[in-house]
Structures are given as structure tokens and as C-alpha cells.
A protein has these predicted regions:
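Post-DEXD/H (motif II) to motif III coupling segment of the RecA-like Helicase ATP-binding lobe
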Residues: 1-6, 180
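C-terminal/domain-terminus segments
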Residues: 158-194
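Phosphate- and divalent-cation-binding pockets in alpha/beta enzyme and binding domains
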Residues: 58-62, 96, 174-175
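Conserved RecA-like P-loop NTPase helicase motor core
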Residues: 22-24, 83, 87-172
Length: 195
């Protein structure tokens, strides 16, 4: 008997759960939406789950709420999760530590990695572009976010996991199509089925 082991092809379609009509991250109902959807995604999936959110306050609030329900399975920015654990982290932490973690069964994108204007460096760069009359979002913030996506999802492609995007801007903004194009090839998941 002969067996050939190889890594999954990186060009196989990635299953993506991204419902239409999700709230935007700056709305009052978004935190509750994020908690409810994350809970559903975690309950229906065996294996490691990562939740990516750059907003510190929202991420810590979600971590606390998920830990209240799922206990010690939920950790914040830890490289030693349980096999069916949940790691909440920001995008930079995930990109820096993904080699130290097992391949995830799913990635939950709470918020797309668009830099916040609360960051002084980002704010200064945007202000300079505004003064020059440039489209600072499409010239600076969107390309930076799009450049992070392939590296962030590569382990998921190799493991055959699924991607869930809970940021309403994906379907609610015209530039959301650019994000979906960056994720190609992918197939839509209309429903969440337990693993």
C-alpha cells in the first residue's frame, strides 16, 4: 500500500459565511450581533476558532462574554489554546503568531482590518492626504487592509476550514466586492451546519 500525503491546495474554494444585512460595526446593535453570531459559529464547529477584531474594547468585551459561556476554552491572544479552543486577537497578533498555533478550523472576522483613525499615525497620514485632496480611504486604508487578507487566511485554506465575516461593511459598502475578490476562490455558505 502506498499513500501520498500533501498539503491542501491553496487555490481550493474557501467556504465563506457572510450573511447579507448585517449591522455595521459603528452601530449600537453590532456588539450583540457579534456575540450571537460568534456563539452560533463556535457551537457548530469542532477544532480551533480564531476571532479577529482590532477594536480592543470590543474584543475584550466579546472575550469576556464568550468565556462566560464557554469557560476556559476562550482565551485572549494565547498561543496555547485547547484543541477546540477559541482565541480572540487582533489582526497583527494573528499574523505574527499564526505559525505558533495549530491550523484553525474557522476564522471569524469580527471587523475587517481597516486601520482606525484613532491611531495617531494613521490619523496624520489621512489628514495629509485630505489636505492634498486625495481619496484617503481607497488610496491608503483599503489597500492596506486588502494586503493583510491573503496571509491571514492562508492557514485556513491549508486546513480546509471556513471563514465567517461578521462585518456588515462587506456587503453594505461598494468596496466590499474588492474584499471578496481578494478572497477568491471562495464558495458561499448560506447556512451554518454543525460539524
Amino acid at each position: 500500500m502506498r499513500a501520498t500525503l500533501r498539503e491542501r491546495e491553496l487555490n481550493e474554494p474557501l467556504p465563506i459565511y457572510a450573511p447579507r444585512r448585517q449591522p455595521l460595526p459603528n452601530t449600537r446593535i453590532y456588539a450583540q450581533h457579534l456575540l450571537e453570531e460568534s456563539r452560533r459559529l463556535i457551537l457548530g464547529q469542532a477544532g480551533l476558532t480564531l476571532v479577529l477584531i482590532n477594536d480592543d474594547q470590543l474584543r475584550r468585551q466579546l472575550t469576556s462574554s464568550l468565556a462566560a459561556e464557554f469557560g476556559r476554552r476562550v482565551v485572549h491572544e494565547s498561543t496555547a489554546p485547547e484543541s477546540n479552543g477559541v482565541v480572540t486577537c487582533n489582526w497583527d497578533w494573528w499574523l505574527e503568531h499564526q505559525e505558533q498555533l495549530p491550523a484553525p478550523a474557522q476564522l471569524i472576522v469580527g471587523m475587517l482590518p481597516i486601520a482606525s483613525l484613532d491611531n495617531p499615525l494613521t490619523s496624520a497620514r489621512v489628514e495629509r492626504m485630505k489636505q492634498q485632496g486625495e481619496d484617503w480611504f481607497r488610496t491608503l486604508l483599503l489597500p492596506e487592509a486588502l494586503s493583510l487578507i491573503p496571509t491571514a487566511i492562508a492557514p485556513l485554506r491549508r486546513s480546509g476550514g471556513r471563514l465567517a465575516i461578521l462585518d456588515g461593511r462587506l456587503r453594505g459598502r461598494s468596496w466590499g466586492d474588492q474584499v471578496l475578490n481578494r478572497l477568491e476562490p471562495w464558495i458561499p455558505l448560506q447556512r451554518l451546519l454543525p460539524e
